[in-house]
């Protein structure tokens, strides 16, 4: 108490109000963290154990069914307050309608394109995700894919293992000094930008929403429209959600604007690129190469595109690191618990 009195003397009224607000928030958070919650959780996909353990410690009953089939999900979802999914499970309107007691649909990851958000909102079901968890993992993959394209690493590896010493055929290009165009400068886009700056790349950015001013100042990013970005960049990486506005954002017209020496990287959502249009510009040499971690159909069926020598493919592994999956599971569990406690 003596300490609080001394602090009070030094503070004006506004400062005291702010201090009391902080103290009250800390006390409320401390109190809420010890409050047990009740409810049942259905985990429909494989997630890290840390999140399951957190929900159980909070008092929730957790049923873990990572291989649940659509028909079983529809018939059993009525018994649960919380539905936890990754990308495999499709939370359709049929599933939402059957979830008669659901309060939360939680996506352990970034995108929500496998959840009928509109149907959930109509039923007053909270839809949450963990976009912050995968940021570093996705960003590192993008850098890896850029280097793979620039130095033909997949081809170099495959030919060397076959006993073919094709050193003279593998003339690459450096990332240093090149222009990286970032389409969608959100959390992931900014992380990639910082990593690219460490490689001495120059940044060009496009986003329909305002880009963080501090980030622009920190990195020297040139902010421009999409067409100018495509015409100027040596590498283009895409980080936008799947929406009607972004479907086939990279169509024939926009792909034709890119330099013939440029590379396109997509780790966001498959349908932002028209794969048939991409195949044509890559096959004709109007685009140097592409790296794809996501596809219009997954697993992908466009074998012609995948088998091109100037295409690097990965099976949607952007967030597939131990650290990212552990963090996503932890973040989602904490959000679920705090919502049920009424804290958020």
Report residues per predicted region.
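C-terminal helix-to-coil terminal segments
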Residues: 4, 13-15, 21-34, 121, ...
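An N-terminal-biased, well-structured beta-alpha scaffold segment characteristic
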Residues: 5, 19-128, 231, 251-257
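N-terminal Rossmann-fold cofactor-binding loop
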Residues: 45, 66-67, 207-209, 268
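Short, Asp-centered acidic motifs that coordinate Mg2+ and/or phosphate
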Residues: 81-82, 104, 235, 263, ...
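Rossmann-like adenosine-cofactor binding region
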Residues: 89-96, 208-304, 320
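Phosphate-binding beta-alpha-beta segment of Rossmann-like dinucleotide-binding domains, i.e.
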Residues: 123, 131-179, 194, 198, ...
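Glycine-rich Rossmann-fold phosphate-binding loop(s) that bind the pyrophosphate
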Residues: 185-186
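N-terminal Rossmann-fold NAD(P) dinucleotide-binding loop
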Residues: 189-190
């Amino acid at each position: 108490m003596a300490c609080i009195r001394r602090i009070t003397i030094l503070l004006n009224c506004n400062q005291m109000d702010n201090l009391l607000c902080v103290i009250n928030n800390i006390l409320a958070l401390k109190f809420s963290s010890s409050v047990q919650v009740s409810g049942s959780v259905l985990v429909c996909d494989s997630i890290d154990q840390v999140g399951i353990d957190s929900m159980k410690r909070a008092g929730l009953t957790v049923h873990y069914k990572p291989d649940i089939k659509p028909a079983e999900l529809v018939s059993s979802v009525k018994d649960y307050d919380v539905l936890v999914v990754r990308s495999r499970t499709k939370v359709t309107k049929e599933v939402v309608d059957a979830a008669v007691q659901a309060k939360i649909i939680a996506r352990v990851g970034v995108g929500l394109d496998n959840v009928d958000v509109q149907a959930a909102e109509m039923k007053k079901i909270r839809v949450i995700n963990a976009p912050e968890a995968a940021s570093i993992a996705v960003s590192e993959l993008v850098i890896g894919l850029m280097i793979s394209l620039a130095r033909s690493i997949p081809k170099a590896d495959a030919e060397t293992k076959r006993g073919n010493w094709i050193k003279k055929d593998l003339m690459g290009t450096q990332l240093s000094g090149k222009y990286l165009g970032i389409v969608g400068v959100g959390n992931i886009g900014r992380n990639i930008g910082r990593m690219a700056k460490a490689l001495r790349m120059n940044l060009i950015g496009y986003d329909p929403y305002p880009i963080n001013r501090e980030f622009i100042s920190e990195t020297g990013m040139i902010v421009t429209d999409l067409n100018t970005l495509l015409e100027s960049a040596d590498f283009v990486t895409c980080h936008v959600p799947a929406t009607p506005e972004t479907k086939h954002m990279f169509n024939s017209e926009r792909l034709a604007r890119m330099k013939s020496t440029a590379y396109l990287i997509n780790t966001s959502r498959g349908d932002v690129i028209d794969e048939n249009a991409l195949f044509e510009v890559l096959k004709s040499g109007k685009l140097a190469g592409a790296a794809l971690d996501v596809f219009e159909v997954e697993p992908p069926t466009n074998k012609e595109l995948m088998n091109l020598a100037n295409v690097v493919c990965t099976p949607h592994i952007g967030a597939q690191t131990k650290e990212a999956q552990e963090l996503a599971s932890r973040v989602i569990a904490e959000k679920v618990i705090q919502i049920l406690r009424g804290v958020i």
